[in-house]
Amino acid sequence: EMSASLVGSEMCIRDRMSPEPKERNTLSTYRMTFAYIGSFVALLLFMPMVNYFKQGHSEQYGWMMGVVIIAVMCAALFYGCFAWTRERVKPIREKQSPLKEDLKDLLHNKPWWILLGAGIAALIFNSIRDGATVYYFKYFVVEEEYSVISFFGVSFVLSGIYLAVGQAANIIGVILAAPVSNRIGKKATYMGAMMIATVLSIIFYWFDKGDIALIFAFQILISICAGSIFPLLWSMYADCADYSELKTGNRATGLVFSSSSMSQKFGWAIGTAVTGWLLAYFGFQANVVQSEETIHGIKMFLSFLPAIGTILSVLFISMYPLSEKKMKVITTELELSLIHISE
């Protein structure tokens, strides 16, 4: 996590590459698409690499070499990112402001607070669904009754396939985010996706353990909705940086994005903790036949509980004030300020 935070500046550069909101949507879409593709590729290739390198060695060596290969690939891609991107948007004030002043400006940035709440709620939604998947398939669906599927020499049970399908559907959602938001706006797209995810999540509760086709179909639809919101969030964070620069003269792009990234990790941590607490509350005990109350609780993890997260996210984003029309005004005023300074 610490190394990921150190290289997280690639998230901050998008608002410096273009001042146009639609172009930022496209940049965010590319970024999130390849992020999900990278995760999907790593999921498929990691175990085959472990199996290859452990031949003639220990399994520990195989895992270590798998991590080394992934790390080298990541380093090369990060260097490529920074070598082949350019900052084209000039700030109003070239002089770097003190961190204390940046923090003060951030705390007075109302749109950022709204996105903070929406992002945390969205991550709670995601983390609860993903965190409970193994329990849902092991104790409710009883995946042991189904055949194991092998792919690239790796055996996948139903829960693994379910998560992989969700990851692939996330990519579809990311790709759809830019064209849809460019047509109806980021706020409307975000709210629409989360409201659809809410309805689908609630319906999910009533599936029987034999409704495998429906379970996977709804996973695809919900994951498309979930995937579409994150490029929109990052694009809106860039708008928050513009808003802050216009109001204070201080852009503080790095702080806006790094604090937002931290808040999303916070949301994931909350969702994971809630999953553990509620499993204990519903009387869960590992590797035994679960009671009816516990099964009810496990079903809640993939239905009503994540729906609470989506509803909270919709409530937050409904208050977001930076519409496309408002951003055009902000962008124009920033450009006029730069012209005035240059004269």
Roles of regions detected by a PLM:
Residues E1-G8, I13, I339-E343:
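Single conserved hydrophobic/aromatic residue that forms the stacking wall/gate
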Residues S5, S9, L214-F230, M236:
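Hydrophobic core of transmembrane alpha-helices in multi-pass small-molecule transporters
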Residues S28-M47, S260-T275:
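Glycine-rich segments within core transmembrane alpha-helices of 12-TM secondary carriers
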Residues V89-L116:
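Juxtamembrane intracellular "pre-TM" segments in multi-pass secondary transporters
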Residues P111-A132:
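Pair of pore-lining "gating" transmembrane helices in MFS-fold secondary transporters
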Residues A132-V157:
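Short amphipathic helix-loop junctions that connect adjacent transmembrane helices
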Residues G173-K186:
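Helix-to-loop junctions at the C-terminal end of transmembrane segments
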Residues I196-G210:
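C-terminal ends and interior cores of transmembrane alpha-helices
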